[in-house]
Amino acid sequence: MGFRELFASSLGDAARAKASLVRGMSGWLNTTLATVQAAGPEIRACAYSALWAEVDSVKELVPLSATMLLNQLRADLKCAQVRAQKCTPASTSRFCSCGGIPLPGENKWEDELVPIPDCPVGRNFCRDGVFCKRHHGPGETLERVQVLVEAPKCPHCQGTGIIPRSEPMAYIRSEYERQTKTFARPSNPLHEWILEEGRESNHARRCSNWYHMSMSQIDKRDNDPCDASTWMAAAQILFDNADAQVYYPGSNYRKLVGGSKGYDDWCQLPPSKEMCNRLFDWWHRQNTPDYYVSEDTLADFVKPRMGSCHLPIEHDVHLLPREWHGRVSAGNTSHFMACLDGLSSSMEEFLDVFYDCAAQFNGDIEIFLDTNEKPSRVVGNLGGVRVLLTTPAVCSPAKLLPEIEESDFDQLEDESISCDSMIPPLFRDNGLSALYANLVLKQATVQSILMAHPDQDEIEDQVDHLENKQGGEIVTTPAFIKMLKEKRKEVRGKEFAEGSEGRLVRASDLTLSREDVFLSGGLFEKFRKSGIVQTFKGKDPKLTKVCVDLTNSQEIIKYPSKEMCSDSSGVHTGQVFTVLNRPLYNELNKLAESGWKEAKSVCLNLHIRSYVPVHTPLYAFCVIMWGHSSDAETASLCGAGVYLGDQEAAVLELPLVCSYLGNSLEDFDAYKRSLVLSTVFFGKSGLFAGQNVFGITAVEFTEYMPTSYGGITHERDSWQAMLRNHQGKDKGRFIAGFNVVDALERDKEEPIKMPNLDLEPVPRTQPIVRTFTGEGKQPLLNKSRSMRIQSFVSFRGSNIPVGRRIDNTAEAINYELGRASTSSVSSRLDESKCNLKAGGSYAFGETIELPATVTPGTVLAVFNIFDKIQETNTKVCSKWLEQGYVSQNLTAISHLAPNAFSGIAIWYIFDAYGKIPGDVTTTFELEMARSFDPHVQVLRDVSTSTWVIDFHKICGQTLNFSGQGYCVPKIWVIAASTFQLARSTATKFRLEFYTRGEKLVRGLAEQPLSYPIEARHLTDLNLMLAPKQIAVGTYAMITFPVSLAAKLQSTSGRTAYSYAAGLLSHFLGVGGTIHFVVRTTSSAFVTSKLRIALWGTVPETDQLAQMPHVDVEVNVDASLQIQSPFFSTANFGNSGSAFYVSTLCAPMAPETVETGSEYYIQIKGIEANPGLCREINYKQRFAWCLLECLDNSKASPIKVKIPSRIGNLSSKHVKVTNFVNALAILCATTGMHHGNCTIHFSWLWHPAELGKQLGRLKFVQGMGINNEHIGDTMCYNSLSNTHSVPFQFGSFAGPITSGGKADEAENWIEIQSPDFSWVASLHVSIEVHEGFKFYGRSAGPLTIPATVADVSAVSGS
């Protein structure tokens, strides 16, 4: 390496440093370098070469190699300043010890497959037994070659040499700036009354009165009132805002409310600085964006715990110069004591937070507890300070730190001074709370110094410490206290007011903490042993992290329909499998990104609340099973027999199963099914199938480990320490079990003997999820092995080991190998570079113009969701495109500003399957639009500007990016009414869509609507009745017939059925309770009061007041029972019940407003009484269509195809009459359908002599558009007139729409006849089998079917 390369490179400084090590070269090189660099390029090139030759010959320098330069550079970078991070106060970056220079690669010998070229014709070059393919050889051979393997990049700087600024440090700075930001005092225009009351004389009188009254009002003397300008600004806030309120300081709970009248509370506002500041805070929270108010807590630092500390302690307390005995100084301490009680409600949490603060200092302290487990004495050394605290007191943190002088510390550090006599009053009298405040304030000072010299390792250590200490996400202290309190409310004892005996459940029986579960090596155990928590130095591979997850809350277990056997003792049912929820995907992903690799389910606390009467002889055998094994003995992790006649029960079970987080994230669906609750019931018969039996709440204790080296070995038979607090007489929870801790609450009844049973494993047939992408499915298990349980006597001893068998069958091995997901790990997008304000959830948006004048039915906008997603190309859209489908529901937000006086309503329709005809462009009739269940935005109601698009509910599937498929998802924006108050100009508003909820399962909805249609399906209808208007000054009654299944017909002749009509058309009538919503859409200038009743006859005004009714002024959600002479109402015609809407007060409006009061009724659903729901007689068999010959006078050969989709048929060869029935309506009003049916054909021959009858019919089954794939064929002559064919409606992917063109891969039946004129008529009927499914919600038909050349299915009834 010559001087030319040396000085021209970027490492010139390091090269000079290396050369300066040679004696006498330093000054000469510097002078020469300056001289040569001042010359031109040619001279510099020659000078470098000449200088190097001269120096090499005279000085005999050793040539500077790359290795020598790398070693010197690393030595310079590994200095003490760099290690201590004090080389520079800048917080942007720091150097890495690798110097940015990659390590040298390594040469390795590898076997490489080298092809052997074929020998030319007539020649043979093959030798040594290796032949080419031409001479019948392999044509290739293995040769050993040397390959250079590059060294891995530095994990700290990725080869750049500079460690970037840490994200925790950036977060700390942003939080510090946010907390130190100040806001100006509100300066609202002052009312003349405020100015009058704020005059100097009036304000002086007010301050004088407040000085004498403050003792009785706030329990202390207020010697420092605010000035007049401050009081007037606060009083103006009360004057302007009727919903404002401010409480007096102290514990009297008095408050002042807002109002603008002369006798309202604004004139009673005292000149108190604290009350004025509270009003200013309230005003800023309402009007100032990003306003931040520090939370009230003792020792809370915003994540991570750094920043300003806010202690709600009395600020003006006189510290007594002598030690006092149990008395608290004067002043209001309720707020401080509330916070202290919140932390010390459990002594463990209080000491935990206390030690965390104390861990920042060297020393040791010892806390003594009294008989009530409260701190009574603290002795020790902390931060070089002697500590002796004997009495708790209240201190002023604002004055605490400045009042500590150096002399105080000098006295404390003197070992010769007696602790009891010479301790300064400041440290002796403040008690535990004073020590706590001192530590917190001192820690805040230390952290501010730390910000000037950031240490990456120290910041990461603190974050890791907080994560491991809290056992989950980093939360603030108030949030952590709130979580603990809510947790105790769930598991602690509470009074059962509605129980049969009103008894109390023992709190000790229902409380389980981490210390009870994680015995040895746990983090909290280390805290106790060390006394003071020390900051973790790096991530120890032996370190474990424990989490407590509320996996299932209020999960309902229903009584199964399958009964295995019965005897004189009772009935033994089949198994009911309930998947226990696991931590959410986002939480699991955060743990994996933080470095945790494995998760072990250690303990499962299963709490059971019985829904059967007390002392009912019903037992349940609950087993926690592993969902990834076909052998019942291997899958059965733990189980217990529970008596359900005692209302409350709980089981502590030990699954002890570990999973790898990487595979869990790749195949998250399989991870969610890893723990399954299997329940077998035994008891007296008489329970109905589907009846709620008991509910469960499962609390899972999980241990996370960074490597396989970490973790604690938990044994199922070594849990005596856990049982110490849960054992005793009458504390057993269950009757018998295996691999469980012990009995914790035994019933008072004697258990009966349960019969022998066979326990089956978790079924491997998961819910079928079909997609339109043709992806392969996982292999399903063909065989499983059950476990025979002969008696519960063997389980009486609790921890009874169960024998395990290894399932080595080929089917099981193939299944376990097939469990691995075929999907690759998707690359993660950078969360910090886009969508910061929306949290990364913004999907797309559309700008819509609202004209100044509109008519009802005006189409404001129509746009395709797919087009908008691809045009916007946000981070969410990129993720969907990578996954191949829309994986979350959408939340739509309309930014049309609220206006209570305009009196207009906007309808938003999600047409998922393109049912709205193409000829609808600028106007859409409201009678047709309301059949789509639109979302109504009322400008006078702010809450209606947001709604959710549920793809599984409305579409029946997730939207796929690989193609449009059957979905044509469009959003229609329609004006539903006119402006009741004239607008000055048109306006534009934004309609935005954000992602919402958990990740959807790819493919079809998991629980679609299926046959047979029952009364329980009527609970979710969402049926909108026609909007009505009552003219101003009109006192009348309007009737809405409850004929909910009738078709809708518009003035233009269009007909439509809603999804609710499709369900209700399966019933002649319904009875029960109707849940509905009444919304007022008129202007706020138009006011009225309505009374709504549901009755069978027209009621009188006095009768209306006595019967069940609902009074409506603006908006109301209500429920009314169907009242009629028949106890139910007809779904067709006007002979049933009706909504009677009567005006209690006729609509009123100002003189210039002449429009009436507009409102609409939306029926949410019907809580039907099954005994009052009369079903149609032909509920399983429906007439489809009738085929007739066009001309009987001549021969008419025909070929008519029946498609595999239900819809209106049309043809140019025959006359087609389509029938209307419940099945046709339901197919037309849903998105897709799929299932097995039987198609029945019946025909009628023209009357003729048998010998002259020449009629023939042929029924051909096939697949595809062309007649290439032919199935069964049946021919009939004049002696037959019926034919039945089992048939499956659907597409190659499963479900299919009710209209559209036939696919290339689709089943069909073709009717062929050489002369159809011999047939008078041919009827086609459909017999629906159980399990026929319907996906999505829509409306139809909205158009009249057009005549085409061939028979085709047209969407309709």
Swiss-Prot record:
- Name where it's found: Host cell junction, Host plasmodesma
Q: Name one GO biological process term.
A: transport of virus in host, cell to cell
| MF-aspect GO terms | structural molecule activity
Q: Which residues form a coiled coil?
A: none
Q: What is its main location?
A: host cell
Instruction: Report whether Disulfide bond shows up as a keyword of the record.
Output: no
What modifications follow translation?
Specific enzymatic cleavages in vivo by the P1 encoded 3C-like protease yield mature proteins.
Keywords for this entry?
Capsid protein, Host cell junction, Host cytoplasm, Host nucleus, Transport, Viral movement protein, Virion
In which domain of life is the source organism classified? Answer: Viruses
Keyword hit for Transport: yes
Gene3D superfamilies assigned? 2.60.120.20
| Any one annotated GO CC term | viral capsid
Sequence similarity: Belongs to the nepoviruses RNA2 polyprotein family.
Query: Additional comments on file?
Result: Virions are comprised of 60 copies of the coat protein.
Instruction: Indicate what this protein is called per its UniProt record.
Output: RNA2 polyprotein
